[in-house]
Amino acid sequence: MNVIAIMNHMGVYFKEEPIRELHRALEGLNFRIVYPNDREDLLKLIENNSRLCGVIFDWDKYNLELCEEISKLNEYMPLYAFANSYSTLDVSLNDLRMQVRFFEYALGAAADIAAKIRQNTDEYIDNILPPLTKALFKYVREGKYTFCTPGHMGGTAFQKSPVGSIFYDFFGPNTMKSDISISVSELGSLLDHSGPHKEAEEYIARVFNAERSYMVTNGTSTANKIVGMYSAPAGSTVLIDRNCHKSLTHLMMMSDITPIYFRPTRNAYGILGGIPQSEFQHATIAKRVKETPNATWPVHAVITNSTYDGLLYNTDYIKKTLDVKSIHFDSAWVPYTNFSPIYQGKCGMSGDRVEGKIIYETQSTHKLLAAFSQASMIHVKGDINEETFNEAYMMHTTTSPHYGIVASTETAAAMMKGNAGKRLINGSIERAIKFRKEIKRLKSESDGWFFDVWQPEHIDGAECWPLRSDSAWHGFKNIDNEHMYLDPIKVTILTPGMKKDGTMDEFGIPASLVAKYLDERGIIVEKTGPYNLLFLFSIGIDKTKALSLLRALTEFKRAFDLNLRVKNILPALYREAPEFYENMRIQELAQNIHKLVEHHNLPDLMYRAFEVLPKMVMTPYTAFQKELHGETEEVYLEEMVGRVNANMILPYPPGVPLVMPGEMITEESRPVLEFLQMLCEIGAHYPGFETDIHGAYRQADGRYTVKVLKENTK
């Protein structure tokens, strides 16, 4: 971080000459000097060059107004105002709290001023670094000798082997040196929440508006289990979103709890909807408790917010209405909601604590903020027994955490602190909205078909768009007003083939073809539905990436309209089955898959498959214990009606459990089986289009088997 910007000093000799001297002195201290053309150029520089560490300007020309504009972008940026002895310094005490320092134009003072700028720059870096990261950097710079773990000893061991040296050179020395042992006492402990680790947790809690925050180094899958193990002791009843992440199913397999499922909606596109307001009401819960064997009044509830497709709840309503001691919002996909006003009232940590309740929010820091994979956080509002909670935390946390993951979690919080964090999120929102508008423009100008966007008809400023009962764009039935909102950052592109109400069109392009085309060109889709593709506009998405996606979509249309051969447009798919795809053209492939989907009446089948849940014969915990005792056998998929499932069955997409361990598909819930069979049939007909179904195993003959409990088991 060594870039200093100097604003124009108007060609006045007594001002320019001291600045020339200062330029030379700063270069002698290894600063790089840049000269923005004007105020707008400077502000763009601050937005786009994060290594800028100071601005030098003439007070008479730019004064306090420029300081305020810079502060909106980065309130910690060191500012250096030069003034002559006749300048009017109309600055209040409050203004002086900004990072502005004054110097007088004088020849021969450059060395002293440069030294002060060097000192202020070091203070700036020290000020913006969060506590644990700062302590880790200091430890690495000190280069201490250790006789403890890890065995590679700062990378030294890797360099004793040719292949190890290649590995070392790829990752670099700082990665190696920062991989250290928990025996390093000056860094404190992740498990004991001491020293700089404790300071990091307190820092994160302040940034994320929490009362208590925990860093988790092996993903939100683990964060969810930590919260669940503490909040739902064995023998208790828990309310769980049926569209939960599989980690919540694993929690139910680990702990002997009785689940009662919230029943979310789903539209014709297969987009996961929210849980209706009625599901949170006391009367509905009382009815479910009465209907569920061994159930008692729930002590805990888990809600996925946002949904995979970007739908956020009115969390204020849920906090106020849901009659349980603790509510856990699994917010893995939205770690950024505290940093833009459009998300107020739509996330777990928004607002004040709720009297008599504990609110948890788990977030995958790595998913949409800047952190290493597996970086996750638990935020808490409400009174918990910290010692008992920490037992659950330690149960699921390694005693050898990777400090790079921990520091990246804290650094992600530091990046979101203050105006700079708001600017990052607002930039993501703006890019996503511009992309949406560009898709709509291209659609209106295209000959024939083009892609569409799942969103309201008119989008103007930045907001989360409400799903209303009098609007048709979302495709959901019986929607509650002021309950669900679409996050602009989650962009769902629609392909031709299906109307909003689920009516199948004569012409269609299954989204899986587009996903394969994009993948061949280095663009990875987050989620692919039958006729929709999900793209996440995280803070790492810039204009170049957005334009590359637009270009790829228009190139797909061109290639599709030319009806190119599959082997030319999708060479990787062709290589999977050259004989099958030898003479096939892209339009033939698209129409054949479309007709197969139409034959199964996919929209109606999806509605029916999720309308009636399989029967819960036993809890997931009991089913898993029986599997551990070997009381299972495999049957073909079509034979599972009337059998108790041993494992969860989870098709991807959308990646949420369809059948839970201990559940049985009955005649009433047979559409669940028919939906799974349709997914398998597409893969059987068209090589390369097999659906990944967790819990179903493809055999050599192409048929799928599942694990069920033996019929004589009790």
From Swiss-Prot:
Cofactor(s) essential for the protein: pyridoxal 5'-phosphate
GO BP: arginine catabolic process
Protein name per the record: Inducible lysine decarboxylase
Family: Belongs to the Orn/Lys/Arg decarboxylase class-I family.
Gene name per UniProt: cadA
CC terms in the record's Gene Ontology section: cytosol
CDD domains for the chain: Orn_deC_like
Record field: catalytic activity: L-lysine + H(+) = cadaverine + CO2
